[in-house]
Amino acid sequence: MESLNALLQGMGLMHLGAGQAIMLLVSLLLLWLAIAKKFEPLLLLPIGFGGLLSNIPEAGLALTALESLLAHHDAGQLAVIAAKLHCAPDVHAIKEALALALPSVQNQMENLAVDMGYTPGVLALFYKVAIGSGVAPLVIFMGVGAMTDFGPLLANPRTLLLGAAAQFGIFATVLGALTLNYFGLISFTLPQAAAIGIIGGADGPTAIYLSGKLAPELLGAIAVAAYSYMALVPLIQPPIMKALTSETERKIRMVQLRTVSKREKILFPVVLLMLVALLLPDAAPLLGMFCFGNLMRESGVVERLSDTVQNGLINIVTIFLGLSVGAKLVADKFLQPQTLGILLLGVIAFGIGTAAGVLMAKLLNLCSKNKINPLIGSAGVSAVPMAARVSNKVGLESDAQNFLLMHAMGPNVAGVIGSAIAAGVMLKYVLAM
């Protein structure tokens, strides 16, 4: 009988909590969205599967060595950790002390847990290498740069303003998060508000990079919101675009784009990086990798490297990035009131960014002979190339011969640049406070 009891106690099912059960269902929902609905499957599938692995009871795949120690509830070991942190020897007090501790102290406690015989789970290791170091989002940005054509932006530089205007959604969302905190509805710190705001840029790698730096405890919810709403761009944007434009404006035909020379395409990423990085060094990592990837593409002398970055490398890193995000889909971090706030603010951010881009296009038309179709302003959010396709689709509904795709790629690419710069602004000023 004792053997049977020991066998049952060894089963993960016997230790399944309500929170873990809910998160398993959330993970299955993400898998269903990725497979059945094809919502950003390249990221949502590994994120969903990482969520499944993270919530298997007793497996500890997403736990660091220190988290494994705290989950073990050994009184002697808890006393040692508590003495180092000068707090009461219970799990809750230790977690509160760790949250307030400096990163160097947290690393010391992690090393102490390793010395006591605990090891981090495989997903925790993935997270430390891929996101904790910031490497994975940067490599993906390099791949995105290698797949990006700056031609439409260079052919019509005014569209850079549309991409810049769409970033208004980012900063409006930061204010929204702080407003919720001010009125006591949902508690958000300034770093958390900044990390949530970047969802408005519709740029998954940037959202993961910034939240990993500013609010790693919210990374799972922010990443899920960012990629889910990116997949929903065809549903979110058209009503806003139609509400802000007239039938006549939607029928505006833009002049043919000029041919951009190879020299311009080679010089642009170099000049862009130097201008932005010299003024805002904190934007250099993201923008630097993006421009490097684009330079490999446009130079034409490293085709093997460009092909590797666009295909093999970005695919491999995407797998580990998704699983690493899944490591944050654990019940005690995801099932919080903050998650609802993130989901709400995320969709508002998309809406504001879309509206700002459209309104900027209308403003430019007031002082320009060559009119811009306001629909391409919505492509200023950096969901590449989905936002540009939505602009083209809505335009074709009003005029079946009005093809806006290449025109919309200009603000779409500008949006990628804008979101990287916005992330640099957040890092510089939020971390300085």
Curated annotation (Swiss-Prot):
It is a multi-pass membrane protein. The keyword Membrane applies. It holds the Pfam family OAD_beta. GO terms for biological process: sodium ion transport. Keywords: Cell membrane, Ion transport, Membrane, Sodium, Sodium transport, Translocase, Transmembrane, Transmembrane helix, Transport. One of its GO terms (cellular component) is plasma membrane. It catalyses: oxaloacetate + 2 Na(+)(in) + H(+) = pyruvate + 2 Na(+)(out) + CO2. GO terms for molecular function: decarboxylation-driven active transmembrane transporter activity; lyase activity. The chain crosses the membrane at residues 13-35, 42-64, 125-147, 160-182, 214-236, 266-288, 308-327, 339-361, 413-432. Its EC number is 7.2.4.2. It is an enzyme of class 7 (translocase). Its cofactor is Na(+). The keyword Translocase applies. Disulfide bonds: none annotated. It is found in: Cell membrane. Belongs to the GcdB/MmdB/OadB family. NCBIfam families: Na_pump_decarbB, PRK15475.1, PRK15476.1, PRK15477.1. Catalyzes the decarboxylation of oxaloacetate coupled to Na(+) translocation. Heterotrimer of an alpha, a beta and a gamma subunit. This is Oxaloacetate decarboxylase beta chain 2. It comes from Salmonella typhimurium (strain LT2 / SGSC1412 / ATCC 700720). The gene is oadB2.
